[in-house]
């Protein structure tokens, strides 16, 4: 039985017994998407099984006051309710007396979901989509990452672990065995891995997994990052999903392929539609994403460093336009049609909280559908080579140049604020404004190197 399969309490207990599980991690994420957990030992005998049954049925209490973006000390008691379909043994932990994890929803009490829990927020939006429009939202992300080794000349510095480039093989690509171990670990966790390969920059890699409903995919992104970091550590390396770890190299993106289905049918395809079969629904969804793009990147590209990637060049998706094959636009529509018709939003990076990013992308696209927005004409020329005047004539704007500007846009976007909910929005803004202030007031090595001469 693998993660993703429905499981009742008795089946979960049998899974624990069969896999000789000694510890269970009850896992959730904070407002920034960092995984948190509390581990419970599985005790022997019938008494231990009864304790486990009670925990699986009722959840575990914890102090939420120390979790970023959650609650104050005066309301700290919170409850983790496990989603047993996510119960899975962690393949990088010892096989003997193994460790399993289960992803949880955060509750304020036995019956009330916590409005600051990112996973619960995405679930609520997906339930609303199902109830109001009989809709489903599917996402297929492509998170890129670097594998790093310590610089032999400076052990405090990390450098790319190989000199390979796009699709390279040995000896330029030193990491096929590591990617093999990553793929095997992901498959043990229930992932449907489609491909793995070296990316453009030295030390940069991509492992692609099959799309799924947005909730499972968000869970998958968190699990994916944990898996890669732990497998890299076993090989003496460090994995990073930092958007732009090195000047002069491509950064790490997380392009998000996505589609919405209504009444069990794909809604983005119309054999009679323009652009080789795109439906009005698809074009309105595109228009919605484009109209909210400036604010959306505050969520999908949430760090100061994110905007070192979002600069012209290095294939960075900064231009608010859409296209069919043209990768210089922020939205691309892959060639596949029929059930595979989808759009690719190219701005996101892997530092985003996937629960919040998916919730906001969906809200932006649905706003376009509900308001019957009209998408502009696709731009099939290389936008990177256009002059500012050419872009102005075509109405092509750029995403904000930094995190502060993106947060300013989010402050003006009521649709995305509603998608986040009051608690998450207010806490997120407070955290990110403070992050920007930390950066704004920091004195960097570049500055001292440039200005000490004065």
From Swiss-Prot:
Function: Probably involved in nitrogen metabolism via ammonium assimilation. Catalyzes the ATP-dependent biosynthesis of glutamine from glutamate and ammonia. Beta-glutamate is a much poorer substrate than alpha-glutamate.
Keyword Cytoplasm: yes
Cellular-component GO terms for this entry: cytoplasm
The protein's name: Glutamine synthetase
Matches recorded under Gene3D superfamilies: Glutamine synthetase, N-terminal domain, Glutamine synthetase/guanido kinase, catalytic domain
Gene Ontology biological-process annotations: glutamine biosynthetic process
Family classification: Belongs to the glutamine synthetase family.
GS beta-grasp domain span: 19-111
Amino-acid positions noted as binding ATP in the UniProt annotation, renumbered to this chain: 194, 257-259, 327, 332, 339
GS catalytic domain: residues covered: 118-454
Binding locations of Mg(2+) 1: 142, 255, 344
Compartment(s) of residence: Cytoplasm
Cofactor(s) the record lists: Mg(2+)
Organism: Methanocaldococcus jannaschii (strain ATCC 43067 / DSM 2661 / JAL-1 / JCM 10045 / NBRC 100440) (Methanococcus jannaschii)
The record's free-text note on cofactor binding: Binds 2 Mg(2+) ions per subunit.
UniProt-annotated binding residues for Mg(2+) 2: 144, 199, 206
Keywords for the protein's UniProt record, in alphabetical order: ATP-binding, Cytoplasm, Ligase, Magnesium, Metal-binding, Nucleotide-binding
Binding site for L-glutamate: 250-251, 309, 315, 327, 346
A single MF term (Gene Ontology): metal ion binding
Cell inner membrane among keywords: no
Assembly information from the UniProt record: Oligomer of 12 subunits arranged in the form of two hexagons.
Regulation of protein activity: Feedback inhibited by glycine and alanine, and inhibited by low concentrations of methionine sulfoximine.
Primary residence: cytoplasm
Enzymatic reactions: L-glutamate + NH4(+) + ATP = L-glutamine + ADP + phosphate + H(+)
PROSITE patterns in the cross-refs: GLNA_1 (PS00180), GLNA_ATP (PS00181), GS_BETA_GRASP (PS51986), GS_CATALYTIC (PS51987)
E.C. designation(s): 6.3.1.2
